[in-house]
A protein has these predicted regions:
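Extracytoplasmic soluble-region selector
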Residues: 1, 14-16, 22, 36-197
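Short recognition patches in nucleic-acid-associated and regulatory proteins
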Residues: 1-10
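Cys/His-coordinated zinc-binding microdomains
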Residues: 25
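Short functional micro-motifs and their immediate structural scaffolds
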Residues: 29
Length: 197
């Protein structure tokens, strides 16, 4: 028999193989190995929201083949609600609730949500290099990581020398001529500086 894979393993079934007899041409199928273990990862385990604020920034990744998100549920709908696509919305009250994400395989993950009266402020800015080297005419987009992901404070970009490097409101740096410029990335009271040369 010569065996070939006809379907890959999923969380519900092992790999399926089909075999063909090289002499008589008869076909046979078999399972190979076992079904996959359900896995999932959340990009955060807890979030803060201001009253009436909503977010779609909570992401589920790392699912095993064949698995998918079945439901998002809230432990207290007066505090926070969530729709089938994972859009989380704070209500009019402050307090805490838990969001449970359930996969079709049955695996679950929990996200803690705290609803507050105050605006959600930026606590840190990461994901940026301190130095950038760009050739004249070349551009690069900055991708700062703002914590918490639900911060309501806008990200702004400024340059110390527009003749050397410009930066747009979307964080696109363009080198204009040889020299050094300081790019400042700011969100609320937090800021990060990087040198472009």
């Amino acid at each position: 028999f010569t065996w070939t894979v006809i379907s890959k393993a999923t969380v519900f079934a092992p790999e399926k193989q089909e075999g063909i007899c090289s002499i008589c041409g008869a076909k046979q199928s078999r399972d190979n190995g076992s079904k996959l273990t359900a896995t999932m990862k959340l990009n955060v385990t807890s979030i803060k929201l201001q009253k009436k604020q909503s977010t779609t920034k909570v992401k589920v990744t790392g699912l095993a083949n064949g698995d998918s998100v079945k439901s998002w549920t809230s432990s207290n709908k007066k505090i926070v609600t969530v729709d089938k696509n994972g859009k989380i919305k704070a209500g009019k009250k402050t307090g805490s609730a838990k969001i449970t994400i359930t996969l079709k395989s049955g695996k679950k993950a929990t996200l803690k949500v705290k609803v507050q009266s105050a605006k959600v402020k930026t606590t840190k800015i990461t994901g940026l290099k301190t130095k950038l080297t760009l050739k004249k005419g070349k551009s690069l987009t900055l991708k700062p990581v703002i914590s918490p992901i639900t911060s309501q404070e806008k990200v702004t970009y400024t340059t110390s020398n527009k003749k050397v490097a410009t930066v747009t409101s979307k964080g696109v740096i363009t080198a204009k001529k040889k020299g050094t410029a300081t790019i400042t990335v700011k969100s609320g009271s937090k800021s990060k500086k990087l040198r472009s040369q």
